[in-house]
């Protein structure tokens, strides 16, 4: 005969006072992020919360971008989440990147396609991976640079999306190198024009500058 179930009264059940707020914040985060696999994402969420690490949470709900073939692929919002989680280190281990990628329920094949664009070893320059991620989102170099500005900027949401000119230069030169068809002369022509713009903007550049008809073609 099985032993009787232990019964507890309300006074014996200790509910942490912060639990309702934790669950409320978790629910809001899940709604904003819309994870493809809620169980997997939830485990990553509470693991990050317990360690005091940046959470795998989007800033807001976002619509599917036109370049996505499915609703489970990389989006600007998810790339921004990865940047928050990994950008504190200039160099990131591929194993750590894969874990964060998996936590966001992103397809392994897409990660391998991005990594395959360069000869990465065990460690990755984070800004290089971010650049390639932006390229995967945008298709063209100008679109990739626009995404990079929107992800890296400290401006308010919907603002001008300024980033330091040095950061822009690094990303542009790297993507031009990966492209392979952009001459050094073309790169220098672009940077010379944009440097003049940056000098008038406290060393910052914004998408409006390189998308302007006054700027030479980026590619």
Curated annotation (Swiss-Prot):
Main location: other
Subcellular localization(s) per the UniProt record: Cell projection, Cilium, Flagellum; Cell projection, Cilium
Entries under SUPFAM superfamilies matching the protein: Dimerization-anchoring domain of cAMP-dependent PK regulatory subunit
Keywords linked to the UniProt accession: Cell projection, Cilium, Flagellum
InterPro entries xrefs: ROP_DD (IPR047844)
Domain of life: Eukaryota
The UniProt record lists the keyword Hydrolase: no
GO cellular component, one term: radial spoke
Chain's role: Functions as part of axonemal radial spoke complexes that play an important part in the motility of sperm and cilia. Important for male fertility. Involved in fibrous sheath integrity and sperm motility, plays a role in PKA-dependent signaling processes required for spermatozoa capacitation.
Oligomer and partners: Component of axonemal radial spoke complexes.
Family of this protein: Belongs to the ropporin family.
Protein name, per record: Ropporin-1-like protein
